[in-house]
Amino acid sequence: MSELDDILTTEEAARLLRVSARTLERWRVRRRIPYVEYPKQGAWAPIRFRRADILEWLRQHVVKPNRNGEAA
């Protein structure tokens, strides 16, 4: 797998996270998830996601149970 294979479109990243592309777009606009904004091409800038960033973001959002078995 090349380094470019680790660059995901919105649809690919959404599939990896098992959420809709619209949900991922909302998270991105609210800056809740890391993304890469390429230089503008005309009126818009292509958005991509790095697989490593997505996986790290997932690790950071694991909710661990406390001693009583309830979410902390």
Describe every region a protein language model picked out:
Residues D5, P46-I47:
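A residue-level structural signature of the nucleotidyltransferase/glycosyltransferase Rossmann-like core
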Residues R26, P39-K40, E70:
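Proline- and acidic/polar-enriched loop/turn elements at helix boundaries
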Residues R51-A72:
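A short, Lys/Arg-enriched interface patch at domain edges and termini
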Residues T9, R50-R51:
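Helix N-cap / beta->alpha transition motif
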Residues M1-R30, Q60:
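Polyanion-binding surface elements
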Residues V36-P46:
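Short Lys/Arg-enriched helix C-cap and helix-to-coil transition segments
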